[in-house]
């Protein structure tokens, strides 16, 4: 039986570029070589597509160690230097010419998780892993996600949405609007970034200007959100028409909240699978996750995050990630493993779910 040719697409123009490479490396190691021929396609920070040669070299880097021992900026410079020294011609994006039959997407964040690459691949009639255009775009925007799931009867944290232009036009007015709505502490978040990039927990007025400046420098829209107390609970959802929900996992942050450095550099958070909440609450979380998955029109996969306060009995949806991380410390593959899907089985299932969506 001939092997199916898979384009493993990674890198990209987002601030999560390096995490995307680490995810792709994990996926490459777990796709069956007997059933699939993997062609790595690397997108540089500047948006240039590179195939095979340099793409494979970058895939083999130990970026996890580089991030731990230096900084995201140093890692980005090292990658750009590799590309420059390779002097490889860009890939011409003719997927059919090299026999690509399906794409495995490990692009995190802007330009990869927000519906843009999905729309491009739909135009090329190339099936791909994960959600389609609409669900990808919708879940990328934290403000729109809240509106959609709240309409389905799912609890979300109280929030307001601001435009960066409003902040730059009248900073004091924005400060006043926020303080009229919330008591400290609260969160300031870019609306369209992942991996907790640009998120600040603001404990007092002196921290507010820097938090807003940081978020506004990264996105044209920001979300200011009430700080919810409770355990951080995550579930993985896998499937198209008949999705399955994993066991619940729990994250105990090593810092004030589970931010980028806690996730990928310090690695100080503690993970618990199953989560340390009563069985009946786990069942309710899983039920709400499935409801959200369907309300948002998801397919393929998503990781859905909650805040759970067992004393009050409250379950609040935090966010939905349509291309979750596949690194060694990522919750999605761990949750699926705890639910009976080994990493190779998970990679196989995701590719099969992608192929199911192929239109004649």
Curated annotation (Swiss-Prot):
**Known catalytic reactions:** 2 D-alanine + ATP = D-alanyl-D-alanine + ADP + phosphate + H(+)
Q: What is its EC number?
A: 6.3.2.4
Enumerate the SUPFAM superfamilies for this protein. Glutathione synthetase ATP-binding domain-like, PreATP-grasp domain
Where is the protein situated, by its record's location annotation? Cytoplasm
Where, by residue number, does Mg(2+) 1 bind?
305, 319
Q: Name one GO cellular component term.
A: cytosol
Cofactor(s) needed, names only, are: Mg(2+); Mn(2+)
One GO molecular function term? ATP binding
The keyword Cytoplasm belongs to this UniProt entry's keyword annotation: yes
| InterPro entries reported for this sequence | ATP-grasp, ATP_grasp_subdomain_1, D-Ala_lig_Van_CS, D_ala_D_ala, Dala_Dala_lig_C, Dala_Dala_lig_N, PreATP-grasp_dom_sf
* GO biological process per UniProt: cell wall organization; peptidoglycan biosynthetic process; regulation of cell shape
Free-text comment on the cofactor: Binds 2 magnesium or manganese ions per subunit.
Q: Could you list this entry's UniProt keywords, alphabetically sorted.
A: ATP-binding, Cell shape, Cell wall biogenesis/degradation, Cytoplasm, Ligase, Magnesium, Manganese, Metal-binding, Nucleotide-binding, Peptidoglycan synthesis
Instruction: Kindly report the protein's main subcellular placement as a broad class.
Output: cytoplasm
Tell me where in this chain the ATP-grasp domain is found: 146-352
NCBIfam families membership = D_ala_D_alaTIGR, PRK01372.1, PRK01966.1-4
Family membership: Belongs to the D-alanine--D-alanine ligase family.
| Its biological purpose | Cell wall formation.
Cited HAMAP family: Dala_Dala_lig
Know the name of this protein? D-alanine--D-alanine ligase
Q: Which organism is it from?
A: Pelodictyon phaeoclathratiforme (strain DSM 5477 / BU-1)
């Amino acid at each position: 039986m001939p092997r199916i040719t898979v384009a493993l697409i990674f890198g990209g123009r987002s601030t999560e570029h390096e995490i995307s490479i680490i995810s792709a490396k994990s996926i490459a190691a777990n796709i069956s070589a007997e059933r699939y021929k993997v062609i790595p396609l690397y997108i540089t920070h500047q948006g240039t597509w590179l195939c095979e040669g340099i793409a494979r070299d970058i895939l083999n880097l130990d970026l996890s160690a580089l991030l731990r021992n230096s900084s995201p900026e140093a890692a980005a410079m090292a990658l750009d230097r590799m590309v420059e020294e390779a002097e490889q011609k860009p890939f011409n994006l003719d997927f059919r010419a090299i026999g690509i039959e399906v794409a495995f997407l490990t692009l995190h964040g802007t330009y990869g998780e927000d519906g843009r690459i999905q729309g491009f691949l739909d135009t090329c009639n190339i099936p791909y892993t994960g959600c389609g255009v609409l669900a990808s775009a919708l879940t990328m925007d934290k403000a729109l996600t809240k509106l959609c799931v709240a309409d389905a009867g799912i609890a979300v944290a109280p929030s307001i949405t601001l435009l960066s232009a409003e902040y730059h036009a009248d900073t004091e007015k924005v400060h006043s609007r926020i303080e009229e709505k919330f008591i400290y502490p609260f969160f300031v978040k870019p609306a369209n970034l992942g991996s907790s990039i640009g998120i600040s927990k603001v404990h007092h007025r002196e921290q507010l200007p820097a938090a807003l400046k940081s978020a506004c420098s990264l996105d044209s829209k920001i979300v200011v959100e009430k700080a919810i107390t409770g355990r951080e609970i995550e579930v993985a959802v896998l499937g198209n028409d008949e999705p399955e929900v994993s066991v619940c996992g729990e994250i105990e942050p090593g810092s004030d909240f589970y931010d980028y450095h806690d996730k990928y550099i310090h690695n100080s958070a503690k993970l618990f699978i199953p989560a340390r909440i009563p069985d009946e609450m786990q069942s309710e979380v899983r039920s709400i996750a499935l409801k959200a998955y369907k309300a948002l029109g998801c397919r393929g996969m998503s990781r859905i995050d909650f805040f759970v306060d067992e004393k009050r009995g409250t379950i609040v949806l935090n966010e939905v990630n349509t291309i979750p991380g596949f690194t060694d410390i990522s919750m999605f593959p761990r949750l699926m493993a705890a639910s009976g899907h080994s990493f190779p089985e998970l990679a196989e299932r995701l590719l099969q779910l992608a192929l199911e969506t192929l239109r004649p």
